[in-house]
Each structure stands twice: as structure tokens, then as C-alpha cells.
Amino acid sequence: MATARPRGRDLELRVARSADDRAAHFLVRHTVFVDEQQIFHDTDRDVWDESAVHVVAAMGPLVVGAVRLYRLDEAGLWQGDRLAVLPDARRTLRAGAPLVRFAVATAGELGGHTMIANIQQRNVPFFQHLGWRRVGLLAPYHGLTHQRMAIGLSAAPSAFADDGYAWALGS
């Protein structure tokens, strides 16, 4: 799995490659989803963390962003979620967009056809700017209004047509 450095920045994007990377990944998520946004009470970890690909954005030794992705089926449907960027990195590094692009590219490299995500309503324009499309209606998810969104991945063709993903795409 490759690493990437967005032009003009010292931000490194990579799949978590060590126990320290994974610990930092979980710490960023905890800081954002438990401490800052209070979406979860004690932890945001769940069963998907066992098989997920954990991605980090780092400035030198400091991990400032995290996202996880995981395969939902053998035909190439992937889920991206738990995108978290520390507040200072949101403003000064604008780490969110490179982190999302890296996650999408990684799922594509792993044979993905389509990635879906539940996006907080306030972040929908950001994801649309990155090429994601709305799927279905707004709905509550972990106590906040979210929009299901999807993006095509550049890798393997789907073993099923998009209508085979009706359950995931809200159609």
C-alpha cells in the first residue's frame, strides 16, 4: 500500500502500518467523535474495526487525521466512515480532502467499485466538491442528520450493476 504527500505540504497519508499508527488513529477518532462532537459516550469503536483498513494523515510524528474503510461485499462495495481530523489540522492543513481522496484511492486499489458513506449534513457540500453524490434522503445516524453518499472507484468493474446495490444506495 502506498503513501501519499499532497503537494506543498508535509502531510503524509498512509494505511496504518504499526501499533502506534493504529493507536493514534483511534485517539484522533476519540478526540473528534467522543470528546468534541459527543456523538459517542465512551468509544466510537465497533465490530467493523476488526477488519477495517485504518488510514492516517500525519504531520511528522503527529497523526492529525483518520478514516477507516472496509469491504461490504465481494463485488466491490466499500464503506468509508469515521473520518476525523483534529481541529487545528482542519484549519491549517485542510487535511480532510486529501484524507478522503486517499481513502477512495486505497479502496479502488483493493478492487473496490463503489464506496458509500453516511455524511453529516453540514459536510455534504464538501463531499460533493470531492465528486461524491447524494443517495436517498437525509436520515438520523448516531443522533445527527446524515446523508448517504456514494462515489465510483477507479478499479475493478462491479460484478453487479448498481441496481444490485439498491439496499446500499437507497434506491
Predicted ranges, named:
Residues 1-54, 58-62, 158-165, 170-171:
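Short amphipathic alpha-helix that is part of the acyltransferase structural core
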Residues 49-51, 74-76, 141-146:
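Short acidic/glycine-enriched loop/turn segments that link adjacent beta-strands
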Residues 56, 61-71, 77-84:
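Conserved beta-strand in the GNAT
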Residues 56-58, 148-152:
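Short, well-ordered beta-strand micro-motif
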Residues 85, 91-105:
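Conserved acetyl-CoA-binding loop-helix of GNAT-fold acetyltransferases
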Residues 99, 123-126:
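Conserved short alpha-helix immediately C-terminal to the canonical SAM/SAH-binding motif I
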Residues 106-120:
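Conserved GNAT acetyl-CoA-binding A-motif
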Residues 118, 133-150:
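Conserved catalytic-core motifs of GNAT/GCN5-like acyltransferases
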